[in-house]
Regions:
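Loop/turn positions that initiate beta-strands
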Residues: 53-54
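Short, contiguous acidic and Ser/Thr-rich linear segments
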Residues: 8-16
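Short amphipathic, charge-patterned alpha-helical segments
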Residues: 16-28
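Short acidic beta-strand-loop surface patches of small beta-rich interaction domains
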Residues: 34-47
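Short, conserved phosphate-binding/catalytic loop or strand-edge motifs used
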Residues: 96-104
């Protein structure tokens, strides 16, 4: 494949990803300067293979596009932490946005106290420090639909069946697999800023402003989010 990036041309193997290209061109730059790839208007994550010849522009962590990937990856982080804390017996459901936060509930309906949320938050921090990779798997639409219906996500399952494709990419981190409707960050190490707070009957997952993702947070911001 013929790939151009930052005014230079590269010949990459079939199946190459933006991560492969970034490894070639980064030159020791901060990883946060490139977390997604803009392939002539098609935004893909670092794990998704190029589909053919293209020109690549890098999207930094502080951009609005990367902020949406940050939010999706943060939801995945929360789900993984809940699976490990509760042994798979209790899942987390993201219900809707509430201001700049996401309102969530536990699958068994219990109302969490802040102390319980702090335990969940610490587990999330552990996963971030480990820097667990986020990878992509290709599955057929029928399998994706069945998976989403099994998880009780009927609206998402209906949406998947309307896609004009035969296969989609699902995200995997360790043994956890789910579909998040968009590009993800390269790995969990980028999710350094987040917070959980009680909000009966559920809780809030606080997502930071985009400007905080590419700057050093102020002391006031540090009190609002975990670092």
């Amino acid at each position: 494949m013929h790939i151009t990036c930052e005014g230079k041309a590269y010949e990459l193997f079939e199946g190459a990803t933006p991560q492969n290209l970034w490894n070639m061109v980064s030159g020791g730059r901060d990883p946060e300067t490139a977390v997604l790839a803009d392939c002539e208007g098609d935004i893909i994550d670092f794990q998704t293979p190029f589909t053919g010849d293209t020109d690549v522009k890098w999207i930094p962590l502080g951009s609005p596009l990367a902020h949406r990937a940050y939010q999706r990856s943060l939801i995945m982080l929360l789900a993984i932490a809940a699976k490990e804390v509760y042994g798979g017996k209790i899942e987390v459901a993201v219900k809707h946005a509430l201001g700049k936060a996401l309102y969530c509930e536990f699958s068994d309906g219990h109302v969490p106290l802040q102390k319980e949320l702090d335990v969940l938050c610490y587990k999330m921090e552990e996963i971030v420090k480990e820097g667990r990779d986020i990878t992509q798997l290709t599955v057929g639409i029928s399998k994706a639909e069945a998976f989403l219906r099994l998880k009780g996500r009927k609206a998402d399952a209906d949406l998947v069946t309307q896609m004009p494709v035969k296969e989609i990419s699902v995200s995997q981190c360790g043994t956890f697999i789910d579909y998040f409707f968009g590009p993800m960050l390269p790995d969990m190490s980028f999710l350094k800023i987040f917070h959980l707070s009680s909000y009966a009957p559920g809780f809030l997952l606080h997502v930071p402003d985009p400007c905080l993702l590419y700057t050093s947070p102020s002391p006031r911001d540090r009190t609002r989010y975990r670092m």
